[in-house]
């Protein structure tokens, strides 16, 4: 799980890369769940929340740029 303070230090390009990586992780976790290979089901929730954190910070930056 990534903290919001760690995410805020990243550049926009790093955020996009991080978002793509998290989406891939979500996809892999969904496949593992569907095939019955997943042992730790809380990983899906953690990945989903990390995606939400990244998107929230991207939206905050977009709003700040629009105001400026």
UniProtKB/Swiss-Prot annotation:
Family matches, as Pfam families: Ribosomal_L29
Any one Gene Ontology BP term: translation
Cysteine-cysteine disulfides: none
Keywords, sorted A to Z: Ribonucleoprotein, Ribosomal protein
GO molecular function, one term: structural constituent of ribosome
Cellular component aspect of the GO annotation: cytosolic large ribosomal subunit
Signal peptide: none
Keyword field contains Ribonucleoprotein: yes
Cited Gene3D superfamilies: 1.10.287.310
NCBIfam families membership: L29
Family: Belongs to the universal ribosomal protein uL29 family.
HAMAP family, alphabetized: Ribosomal_uL29 (MF_00374)
UniProt-listed PANTHER family: 60S RIBOSOMAL PROTEIN L35/50S RIBOSOMAL PROTEIN L29, LARGE RIBOSOMAL SUBUNIT PROTEIN UL29C
Protein name in UniProt: Large ribosomal subunit protein uL29
Lineage of the organism: Bacteria, Pseudomonadati, Pseudomonadota, Alphaproteobacteria, Acetobacterales
Gene transcribed to yield this protein: rpmC
